[in-house]
C-alpha cells in the first residue's frame, strides 16, 4: 500500500491541527503504473531513465571507457569528440525523457472522467489518493470508496473569485484538493480553508445556507464535490452496513459490510474498531474473504494498544485447550513466530510461553504443527554474539555439547549450568554454535570443537537457536543407541509426505543432501548443505511451490492484498517464489527465504581467490570457496608451488603491516575459514615451512604493502563502490524488524530501541556528508572535478542496483551549498556528466508527492532487492498515523492499524530476496549492455534479470577458472572499497565544510560597498544555488548591460529540469455562477468548472508541456518568459545581493535536489489584460550586503523532501528583483508554478531528509523573510501577521524526528544572530525565489498581491505537526518598506563566484529594453514561440560571435515574435530608472570574462 499524502503546507480545520496535510494535490497523484497497457516501457515512461530503450545501453560507452576491467580509468583528458560518442545518445535520451506521455496525471484523468465512466481501477486510484485527507479522516474505506465513485472535479482558475456568497443555499459537500479559500464572516472574522479541508452540507437533506463569503486565495484552486443527495445517501448507508457487536449493553466491536468489487463475489464483514479484548478474541474467529490479513495485522500492531504480549499469550494457551479452537490457535502462534520472532527472543516470559506451547503440541500429538513451529524458530532466529571468560584453560566448560561433523551435524548446546556465566550471557539448550573466536563451527568435529573451547580462556561465541535440527540430532542419537550403529540416511529416507509446504520441502531436501555428503566430505546438516538445495529449489521452484509468483502480485502487493481488493498494477515475470501463498493451515514460513536457507552464504563453488606467497616472494593464485579452511589452502598451495613435502610441514601465515610500519606475522589455525574475507589490504598470506624461521616479508615488501593499502576514491571502481554501498545499505534495510517501524511511529519503548531502523536512517546522512567531505578536501581543482564525476557515476550505478537511498544521498551531497558554489570546478565537468547528473536529480523531483520516484518504485520491472528512499517511507507512515485517530468512540481504530500494517508489509517485501544480495548486486553490474537501460524502464530488463542471474553468472564463473588473477584483482578492488568505506572520516559540520569550500574557491568581491549599508558579519558563507553555467565577470566601471555575445556553456547543470507534466491552466471562471444552488440546476457550476477545465487542459497541453531537454541544453540570457514583463527589483540602499542570473528565467527545480540557479524559461500564453513586464538586472554594490548570518532555524519542513535544500539561507540571496509584480493573475500555468522551486540553497542541511511531497515546500516560507511584491510605483505594504514558523507546513517533520540532532544544533545558537540584522537587512529582501508565477500557488505562505490586493498568508499554515512555541516565535518585521519608482525598476545581477553564464539565446528570444517598451497592457499578438521549437532551431543556427548591434533584430527573432520590436539596448546614462544605481559601478562585461549581466 502506498499512502500518497504528503506533508502539510496549509491550514487545517479546528482540532485537526495535529494532522498533516498533503502539500499540493497536483503533486500527489498515484504512480503505480503509468502505462498498464504498454508492455514496452521506454525510458521516458520510467520517470528516471537516462538511457534509451533500444536494447543496448546508451551509457555503455561511458562504462566501457571509464570502467576498465581492472578498475576505473579516467579518460577525461582525452578529446571528448573523438571518444564520447554517447553524447548524442545522451542528448536524445534526455529529450526523450521529456516525452509528453510522462505528463499523464493518473488521478487527474480519473477525476475528469464522468462518474458513471469510472472503472473499479479508477476508483481505487482515487481512493488511494484521497484516503489520507483530513476531510476523509475516520471514514471507513467503503465510505471513501463510495464517495470516490460519485465525486465531481472542479477548478477555479483565478484567485479572488467568489465561490459562495453569504446566505447562498448549499447543494454539495466539497473537499479542497489544491490551493486555499478564505471565508469572510459577516462579523469580519475570516477563516482559511486549505488543501484537504472540506466545506458544504452535512449528511442530511435539510436545506443549509452558506455563512460568510468564500473566495479563492490562490490561482488554480481544485475541488472535488459530492452532491448533497449522494453525500447523504452514502453516509447514511454506512449505518446500515455497520454490524455492531454488543456485550452487556456496550458496543465492543464494529464491523462493516464491504463489497470489494462490483461483481459481488467478494463481500463480507471486516473489523473496523473494537475493544482490545474483543480484537484479541477475533484472532480465533472466522475471518471473511474481505479481511484475510487480520491475524498478521493484529500481531504487528497489538503493541499499540496492549501493554504486554503475554495478554495475548495467556489467552492463546487457554483457547488451545478447546479442541474446536486448537487449529486456529496453532495457526496464530505459527504466524506470530514466523513474522515477529523478536517478540520471543530475549523475553523470558514469551520464551516460556513458547516452550509451554511446544509441550502442548507434543501432548496432543500434533507432530506436523510442532515441526512447523521448530522450522519457524530455526528460520527466524537471529545470530547472537556472547563473550565468555574462563579463569584458566583447565576450568571446565559450563555447558555440554552434542553433534559434530562426524554425525553430519553442527555443534549444539545440550545443557547449560544453571548458575553459570553462560546462562547469564543467554546461552541455552538447543543453541547451535556457529563460530568461536573467528573459527567456523558449522563443519567441525566435536573433539576439535571441544579442544578449541578448552584451550582458550576468552571465548567470543556466535550462536543461533536451531531447535529443529537439534531435535533431529537427539532423535538420531536415540536411534543409534537403540540400533547400536550410526545411521547414514539415503535419499529414500525423505519422509513420505503427501504434500510439501515450502518449509517442508526446503528443510527435508536440505537435510538429505547434507547427510548424503557425509561420506564424501563432512558437511554439517544445519541449515546448510544449502548450495545443492538451492539448485534443487531453483529447478523445482516453479513447479512445486504454490503458483502465485510475482507476476500475480509483485512487490507492492501480496496475496492478502489482492484478496482485499487492491489493484494489481505490477506485472513481474514469475522468477521468484513469493511468500504469503500457502494455505491458511500452513502459514508461510519462508516469508524471507534467506532467513531459513541462509542465502547469505555464497555457493560452495570455488568463487574466491587467494594470493599465496612464499618466502622468496613468488606467488600463486588459489581458487577457494568461503568454507575452505586454512589447512585445505596449504594443501592446494603446496600443489601449486610444486613443493615436495607433506602438508603437515607447512602452515598458512598472515603477514600484515601496521600504519606505523611494524610487520606482524601470525600462524592461522587450520580450521580458519572465510580466508578471502579476512585478509587486509596491508596483509599477505604466506606458505610457511614450520621447520624454518625465515623472514617472510622484507622491509621493502612491507613498504610496498603499506603503499598499496593507502587508497583514494579516484583509485576505486565506481561499480564496486556502488555495489558495496548497496550491500551495506541492503544489509541494514533487511535487518529492520517490522515491529521497529511501529515502535518508532508510536514512540513505544522496546528492548531493541529500533536500533536497526536508526542505523538505516543515519546512513543517508553519512553518505551525504561523505560526498561533500571528499570533494572539499581535495585542493586540486582538476581532481575535484574528477571526484564529482566519480560520484555521478557511482550514483548511476546505485540506480542500477536499485539503491535509491545512496543515490539520493550522493545527489544531495553534490547539491550541498559548499559543493554547489564551486563554480569553476563545475565548469570543468564534461557536458555529458552534467546531463547525467541532471537526469539523476530528475528522478527525485519532489513534485506530486515524488511521483517520478514512486513511478519507478512501483514499476513493472522492479524486483527485490530494492533499497527505497527512507525519508519517503517514514513520511508515508507518519501520514497514516497522524491523519487518523488511534481511538474512535473509545474503541481501537483497527482500520488505521490495518493501513499501517499494509504499508509496512509493502516495505518489507522490498527486502525479501531469495539469493545473496551481494550476488544480485554483482550480477547486475555486469549487465550494462544487455539490460538496455540504466533505469528500470527497459522492456526486457526483467526477463534479462532472470536469465542473467543464472546464465550470466555462470559465464563469469567459467571465465574465473581461466583467469584467477582477474578474479583476484576484482576481489582486491572490493577489499579496497570496503577498507575505504570503513575508514571514512566524515566532516559533518556545515561551517567546516563552508570553510573548506572557501579555501577551494575563495569568494570574490568586485563591487564597492554602499556607504549606508550595514554589512553582515560574514559575506560569503551563504550557501548558493547550484551552478548556473559559466559566468562573465562584471567589470565595475563599465556601463550596465552591454549586449553579450552568446558563449558556449556546459549544459547539464545550469538549469533544473523542467516539469514533464503539462500545466493545468484553466480558463478563468470569473463569469461562471457561484457554487450555490442559484445555478439552474444543482452542481451546474461544478460541472461547468470541471468540463471547462478538462477542455482547456487538452487544448493547452501541447503549448504548455515543457521539454526537459530545453532546460538542460539552453536557457536564454534574455527573458523568454511569455511576453516581456517588468520584474521590479527592490534595490533598497544597496542591499540587493546575489541575484539570479539576469532575472530572466523560470525558477523551476523540477528535478534538482537543490535547485540550480539558472532558471528554466517557460512560455506562458498571456491574456489581453496582462501587463507587460521586463525582467531587469541590478548589480549589487557590495557582496556582503544583505548577506545575513543565517544559520537558520531549521523548521520541520526544511527537512522536507520537497525542500531539498532548506531555503532560508539563500532565498534571500536571490534578491527581490526576481519577484514579478503581478496585478494580473495568470502569470504561470499552475504546474510550472508549482515546480518552480527555489534556487535553493541553504547549506543543504536537511536536503537529504527531505520528505515533503510538494516542490513548493522549497519556496514555501522563507524563514524570517517574506516574499512580497513591489507595487509598480510607490510603497510596498507589509501585512505580516503570521508567525514565521506557522507559515511552513510541516509535513516533513518526521524527518525532523529522524534527523533532529542535526537541526537543533543550529536552532538555538543562531536565533540571536538571526534577529540582529533582520530589521535592517531582511526587510529589504524579497524572497524572490518563491515562484515566478507565484500567483499560481497560494500555499507558499508568502504575501502576495493579486489584482491589486494584498493577500496575507498568516493562516495558511496547516501543519499537521504542531510547531513548538520556540520555533514559532514571530520575527519582527518592519511594517512598511518604501520603494521608490526608481528602485522598483532596478536590475538583477549575479554575484561573481556563484553563478555561471546562462546558455546561449535561442533564435526568437531577444530582450526588449525597458526604455523602449511602453507601460500598460501589452498587445495581444505579442507572444513568444514555443520554447521547444525555438530551442530546436537554435541548435541549427550558427551562434554569432558578436552580439547584434542595437537596433538589429536577428531574423529568427523577428520571425518568431511578430509584433514585437526586440533589440539590444544599452541604457543611456541619463535613463532615470537607472539613476540610483549609477554610482554603484554597474557594469557590462566583455565577452571573454566570467560574469554576464543582461538587461532585458
Curated annotation (Swiss-Prot):
Q: Where in the cell is it found?
A: Cytoplasm; Cytoplasm, Perinuclear region; Cell membrane; Late endosome
Q: Which GO terms describe its biological process?
A: adenylate cyclase-activating adrenergic receptor signaling pathway; adenylate cyclase-modulating G protein-coupled receptor signaling pathway; blood vessel development; brain-derived neurotrophic factor receptor signaling pathway; cellular response to cAMP; cellular response to cGMP; cellular response to nerve growth factor stimulus; establishment of endothelial barrier
Mark out the compositionally biased spans (Acidic residues).
Answer: 83-94, 1485-1496
Q: What happens when the gene is disrupted?
A: Mice appear normal until 7.5 dpc, but become grossly abnormal and dead at mid-gestation. Show severe defects in yolk sac blood and major vessels formation. Show impair callosal axons to cross the midline during cortical development. Show disruption of all three midline commissure fibers crossing, the corpus callosum, the anterior commissure and the dorsal hippocampal commissure during cortical development.
Q: Where is this region: Disordered?
A: 40-59, 68-101, 1002-1051, 1093-1159, 1224-1256, 1303-1369, 1390-1496
- Output the CDD domains linked to this UniProt entry: CAP_ED, PDZ_RapGEF2_RapGEF6-like, RA_PDZ-GEF1, RasGEF, REM
Record carries keyword Secreted: no
Ranges where the Ras-GEF domain occurs: 717-944
Write out the biased-composition intervals (Polar residues).
1246-1256, 1306-1330
Q: Give the chief site where it resides.
A: cytoplasm
Bias regions of kind Basic and acidic residues — which residues? Answer: 1227-1237
Every copy of the Ras-associating domain together lies at 606-692
Q: Which InterPro entries match?
A: cNMP-bd_dom, cNMP-bd_dom_sf, PDZ, PDZ_sf, RA_dom, Ras-like_Gua-exchang_fac_N, Ras_GEF_dom_sf, RASGEF_cat_dom
**Expression (tissue specificity):** Expressed in all layers of the cerebral cortex, hippocampus and cerebellum. Expressed in the cortical plate, cingulate cortex and the subventricular zone. Expressed in neurons and endocrine cells (at protein level). Expressed in melanoma cells.
Tell me the keywords, alphabetical order.
Answer: Cell junction, Cell membrane, Cytoplasm, Developmental protein, Differentiation, Endosome, GTPase activation, Guanine-nucleotide releasing factor, Membrane, Neurogenesis, Phosphoprotein, Ubl conjugation
Phosphothreonine-modified residues are 644
Which positions does the record annotate as the modified residue Phosphoserine?
501, 806, 930, 933, 1022, 1079, 1088, 1094, 1115, 1119, 1158, 1175
Which annotated residues bind a nucleoside 3',5'-cyclic phosphate? 135-254
Q: What does this protein do?
A: Functions as a guanine nucleotide exchange factor (GEF), which activates Rap and Ras family of small GTPases by exchanging bound GDP for free GTP in a cAMP-dependent manner. Serves as a link between cell surface receptors and Rap/Ras GTPases in intracellular signaling cascades. Also acts as an effector for Rap1 by direct association with Rap1-GTP thereby leading to the amplification of Rap1-mediated signaling. Shows weak activity on HRAS. It is controversial whether RAPGEF2 binds cAMP and cGMP or not.
Protein name as catalogued:
Rap guanine nucleotide exchange factor 2
What is the species listed in this Swiss-Prot or TrEMBL entry? Mus musculus (Mouse)
Amino acid at each position: 500500500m502506498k499512502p500518497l499524502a504528503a506533508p502539510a503546507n496549509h491550514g487545517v480545520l479546528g482540532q485537526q491541527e495535529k494532522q498533516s496535510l498533503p502539500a499540493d494535490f497536483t503533486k500527489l497523484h498515484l504512480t503505480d503504473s503509468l502505462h498498464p497497457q504498454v508492455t514496452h516501457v521506454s525510458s521516458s515512461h520510467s520517470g528516471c531513465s537516462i538511457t534509451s530503450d533500444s536494447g543496448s545501453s546508451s551509457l555503455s560507452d561511458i562504462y566501457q571507457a571509464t570502467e576498465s576491467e581492472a578498475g576505473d580509468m579516467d579518460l577525461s583528458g582525452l578529446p571528448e569528440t573523438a571518444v564520447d560518442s554517447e553524447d548524442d545518445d545522451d542528448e536524445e535520451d534526455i529529450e526523450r525523457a521529456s516525452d509528453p506521455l510522462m505528463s499523464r496525471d493518473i488521478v487527474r484523468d480519473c477525476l475528469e472522467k464522468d462518474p458513471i465512466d469510472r472503472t473499479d481501477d479508477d476508483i481505487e486510484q482515487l481512493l488511494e489518493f484521497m484516503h489520507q485527507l483530513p476531510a476523509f479522516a475516520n471514514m471507513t474505506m467503503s465510505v471513501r470508496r463510495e464517495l470516490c465513485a460519485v465525486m465531481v472535479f472542479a477548478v477555479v482558475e483565478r484567485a479572488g473569485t467568489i465561490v459562495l456568497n453569504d446566505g447562498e443555499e448549499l447543494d454539495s459537500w466539497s473537499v479542497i484538493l489544491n490551493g486555499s479559500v478564505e471565508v469572510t464572516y459577516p462579523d469580519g472574522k475570516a477563516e482559511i480553508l486549505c488543501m484537504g479541508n472540506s466545506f458544504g452540507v452535512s449528511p442530511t437533506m435539510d436545506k443549509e445556507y452558506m455563512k460568510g463569503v468564500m473566495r479563492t486565495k490562490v490561482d488554480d484552486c481544485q475541488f472535488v464535490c459530492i452532491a448533497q443527495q449522494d453525500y447523504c445517501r452514502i453516509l447514511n448507508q454506512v449505518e446500515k452496513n455497520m454490524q455492531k457487536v454488543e456485550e452487556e449493553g456496550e458496543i465492543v466491536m464494529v464491523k462493516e459490510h464491504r463489497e470489494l468489487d462490483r461483481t459481488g463475489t467478494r463481500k463480507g464483514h471486516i473489523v473496523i474498531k473494537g475493544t482490545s479484548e474483543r480484537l484479541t478474541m477475533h484472532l480465533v474467529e472466522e475471518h471473511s474473504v474481505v479481511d484475510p490479513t487480520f491475524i498478521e495485522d493484529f500481531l504487528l500492531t497489538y503493541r499499540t494498544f496492549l501493554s504486554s504480549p503475554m495478554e495475548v499469550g495467556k489467552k492463546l494457551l487457554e483457547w488451545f485447550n478447546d479442541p474446536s479452537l486448537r487449529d486456529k490457535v496453532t495457526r496464530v502462534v505459527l504466524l506470530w513466530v514466523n513474522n515477529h520472532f523478536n517478540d520471543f527472543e530475549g523475553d523470558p516470559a514469551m520464551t516460556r510461553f513458547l516452550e509451554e506451547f511446544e509441550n502442548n503440541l507434543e501432548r496432543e500429538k500434533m507432530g506436523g504443527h510442532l515441526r512447523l513451529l521448530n522450522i519457524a524458530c530455526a528460520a527466524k532466529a537471529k545470530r547472537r554474539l556472547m563473550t565468555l571468560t574462563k579463569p584458566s584453560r583447565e576450568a571446565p566448560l559450563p555447558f555440554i555439547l552434542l553433534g559434530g561433523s562426524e554425525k553430519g551435524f553442527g555443534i549444539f548446546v545440550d545443557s547449560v549450568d544453571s548458575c553459570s556465566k553462560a546462562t547469564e550471557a543467554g546461552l541455552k539448550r538447543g543453541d547451535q554454535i556457529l563460530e568461536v573466536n573467528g573459527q567456523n563451527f558449522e563443519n567441525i568435529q566435536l573433539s576439535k570443537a571441544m579442544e578449541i573451547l578448552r584451550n582458550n580462556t576468552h571465548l567470543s561465541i556466535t550462536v543461533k537457536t536451531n531447535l529443529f535440527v537439534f531435535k533431529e540430532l537427539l532423535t538420531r542419537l536415540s536411534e543409534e543407541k537403540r540400533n547400536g550403529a550410526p545411521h547414514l540416511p539415503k535419499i529414500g529416507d525423505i519422509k513420505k509426505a503427501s504434500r510439501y509446504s515450502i518449509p517442508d520441502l526446503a528443510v527435508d531436501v536440505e537435510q538429505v543432501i547434507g547427510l548424503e555428503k557425509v561420506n564424501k566430505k563432512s558437511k554439517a546438516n544445519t541449515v546448510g548443505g544449502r548450495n545443492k538445495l538451492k539448485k534443487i529449489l531453483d529447478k523445482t521452484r516453479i513447479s512445486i511451490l504454490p503458483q502465485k509468483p510475482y507476476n500475480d502480485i509483485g512487490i507492492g502487493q501480496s496475496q492478502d492484498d489482492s484478496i482485499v481488493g487492491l489493484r494489481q498494477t505490477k506485472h513481474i515475470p514469475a522468477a521468484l517464489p513469493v511468500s504469503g501463498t500457502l494455505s491458511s493451515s500452513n502459514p508461510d514460513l519462508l516469508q524471507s527465504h534467506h532467513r531459513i536457507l541462509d542465502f547469505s552464504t555464497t555457493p560452495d563453488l570455488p568463487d574466491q581467490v587467494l594470493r599465496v606467497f612464499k618466502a622468496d616472494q613468488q606467488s600463486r593464485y588459489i581458487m577457494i570457496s568461503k568454507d575452505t579452511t586454512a589447512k585445505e589452502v596449504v594443501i592446494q598451495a603446496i600443489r601449486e608451488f610444486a613443493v615436495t613435502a607433506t602438508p603437515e610441514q607447512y602452515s598458512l601465515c598472515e603477514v600484515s603491516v601496521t600504519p606505523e610500519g611494524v610487520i606482524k606475522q601470525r600462524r592461522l589455525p587450520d580450521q580458519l575459514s572465510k580466508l578471502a574475507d579476512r585478509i587486509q589490504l596491508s596483509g599477505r598470506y604466506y606458505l610457511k615451512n614450520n621447520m624454518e624461521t625465515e623472514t617472510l616479508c622484507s622491509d621493502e615488501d612491507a613498504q610496498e604493502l603499506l603503499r598499496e593499502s593507502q587508497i583514494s576514491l579516484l583509485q576505486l571502481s565506481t561499480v564496486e563502490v556502488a555495489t558495496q554501498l548497496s550491500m551495506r545499505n541492503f544489509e541494514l534495510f533487511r535487518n529492520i524488524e517490522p515491529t521497529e517501524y511501529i515502535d518508532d511511529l508510536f514512540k513505544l519503548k522496546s528492548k531493541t530501541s529500533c536500533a536497526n531502523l536508526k542505523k538505516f536512517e543515519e546512513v543517508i546522512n553519512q553518505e551525504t556528508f561523505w560526498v561533500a567531505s571528499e570533494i572539499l578536501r581535495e585542493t586540486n581543482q582538476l581532481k575535484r572535478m574528477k571526484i564529482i564525476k566519480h560520484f555521478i557515476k557511482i550514483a548511476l550505478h546505485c540506480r542500477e542496483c536499485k539503491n535509491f537511498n545512496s543515490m539520493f544521498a550522493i545527489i544531495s551531497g553534490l547539491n550541498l551549498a559548499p559543493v554547489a558554489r564551486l563554480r569553476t570546478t563545475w565548469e570543468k565537468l564534461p557536458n555529458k556528466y552534467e546531463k547525467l547528473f541532471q537526469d539523476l536529480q530528475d528522478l527525485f523531483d519532489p513534485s506530486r508527492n515524488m511521483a517520478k520516484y514512486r513511478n519507478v518504485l512501483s514499476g513493472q520491472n522492479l524486483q527485490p532487492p530494492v533499497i527505497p528512499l527512507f525519508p519517503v517511507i517514514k513520511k508515508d507512515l507518519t501520514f497514516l498515523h497522524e491523519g487518523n485517530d488511534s481511538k474512535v468512540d473509545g474503541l481501537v481504530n483497527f482500520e488505521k492499524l490495518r493501513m499501517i500494517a499494509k504499508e509496512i508489509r509493502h516495505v518489507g517485501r522490498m527486502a525479501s530476496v531469495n539469493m545473496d544480495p551481494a550476488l544480485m548486486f554483482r550480477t547486475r553490474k555486469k549487465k550494462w549492455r544487455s539490460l538496455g537501460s540504466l533505469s528500470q524502464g527497459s522492456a526486457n530488463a526483467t526477463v534479462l534479470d532472470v536469465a542473467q542471474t543464472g546464465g550470466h553468472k555462470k559465464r563469469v564463473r567459467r571465465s574465473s577458472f581461466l583467469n584467477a588473477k582477474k578474479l583476484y584483482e576484482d576481489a582486491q578492488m572490493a577489499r579496497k572499497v570496503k577498507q575505504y568505506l570503513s575508514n571514512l572520516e566524515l566532516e559533518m559540520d556545515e561551517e567546516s565544510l563552508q570553510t573548506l569550500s572557501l579555501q577551494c574557491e575563495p569568494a570574490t568581491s568586485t563591487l564597492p560597498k554602499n556607504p549606508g549599508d550595514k554589512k553582515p558579519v560574514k559575506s560569503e558563507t551563504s550557501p548558493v544555488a547550484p551552478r548556473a553555467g559559466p559566468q562573465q565577470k562584471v567589470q565595475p566601471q563599465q556601463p550596465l548591460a552591454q549586449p553579450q555575445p552568446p558563449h558556449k556553456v556546459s549544459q547539464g547543470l545550469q538549469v533544473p529540469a523542467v516539469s514533464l507534466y503539462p500545466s493545468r491552466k484553466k480558463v478563468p471562471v470569473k463569469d461562471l455562477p457561484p457554487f450555490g444552488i442559484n445555478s439552474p440546476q444543482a452542481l451546474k457550476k461544478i460541472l461547468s468548472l470541471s468540463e471547462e477545465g478538462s477542455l482547456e487542459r487538452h487544448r493547452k497541453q501541447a503549448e504548455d508541456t515543457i521539454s526537459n531537454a530545453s532546460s538542460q541544453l539552453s536557457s536564454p540570457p534574455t527573458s523568454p518568459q511569455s511576453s516581456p514583463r517588468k520584474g521590479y527589483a527592490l534595490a533598497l540602499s544597496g542591499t540587493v545581493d546575489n541575484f539570479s542570473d539576469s532575472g530572466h528565467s523560470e525558477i523551476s527545480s523540477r528535478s534538482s535536489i537543490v535547485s540550480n540557479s539558472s532558471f528554466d524559461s517557460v512560455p506562458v500564453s498571456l491574456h489581453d489584460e496582462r501587463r507587460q513586464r521586463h525582467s531587469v538586472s541590478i548589480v549589487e554594490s557590495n557582496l556582503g550586503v544583505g548577506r545575513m548570518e543565517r544559520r537558520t532555524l531549521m523548521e520541520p519542513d526544511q527537512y522536507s523532501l520537497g525542500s531539498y535544500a532548506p531555503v532560508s539561507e539563500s532565498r534571500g540571496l536571490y534578491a527581490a528583483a526576481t519577484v514579478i509584480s503581478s496585478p494580473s493573475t495568470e502569470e504561470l500555468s499552475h504546474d510550472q508554478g508549482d515546480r518552480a522551486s527555489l534556487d535553493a540553497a541553504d547549506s543543504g542541511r536537511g536536503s537529504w531528509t527531505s520528505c515533503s511531497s510538494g516542490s513548493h515546500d522549497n519556496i514555501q516560507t522563507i524563514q524570517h523573510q517574506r516574499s512580497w511584491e513591489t507595487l509598480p510605483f510607490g510603497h510596498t505594504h507589509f501585512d505580516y501577521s503570521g508567525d514565521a514558523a506557522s507559515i511552513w507546513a510541516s509535513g516533513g517533520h518526521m524527518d525532523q524526528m529522524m534527523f533532529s540532532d542535526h537541526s537543533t544544533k543550529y536552532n538555538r545558537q543562531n536565533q540571536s544572530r538571526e534577529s540582529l540584522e533582520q530589521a535592517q537587512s531582511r526587510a529589504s529582501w524579497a524572497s524572490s525565489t518563491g515562484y515566478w508565477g507565484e500567483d499560481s500557488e497560494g500555499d507558499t505562505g508568502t504575501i502576495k498581491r493579486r489584482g491589486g490586493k494584498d493577500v496575507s498568508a498568516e493562516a495558511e499554515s496547516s501543519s499537521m505537526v504542531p510547531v513548538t512555541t520556540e520555533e514559532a516565535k514571530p520575527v519582527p518585521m518592519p511594517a512598511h518598506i518604501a520603494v521608490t519608482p526608481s528602485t522598483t525598476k532596478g536590475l538583477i545581477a549575479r554575484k561573481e563566484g556563484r553563478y555561471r553564464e546562462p546558455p546561449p539565446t535561442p533564435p526568437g528570444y531577444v530582450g526588449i529594453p525597458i526604455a523602449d517598451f511602453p507601460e500598460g497592457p501589452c498587445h495581444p499578438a505579442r507572444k513568444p514561440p514555443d520554447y521547444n521549437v525555438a530551442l530546436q532551431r537554435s541548435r541549427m543556427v550558427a551562434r554569432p560571435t558578436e552580439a547584434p548591434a542595437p537596433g538589429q533584430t536577428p531574423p529568427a527573432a523577428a520571425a518568431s515574435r511578430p509584433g514585437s520590436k526586440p533589440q539590444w539596448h544599452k541604457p543611456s546614462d541619463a535613463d532615470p530608472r537607472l539613476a540610483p544605481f549609477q554610482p554603484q559601478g554597474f557594469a557590462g562585461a566583455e565577452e571573454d570574462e566570467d560574469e554576464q549581466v543582461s538587461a532585458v
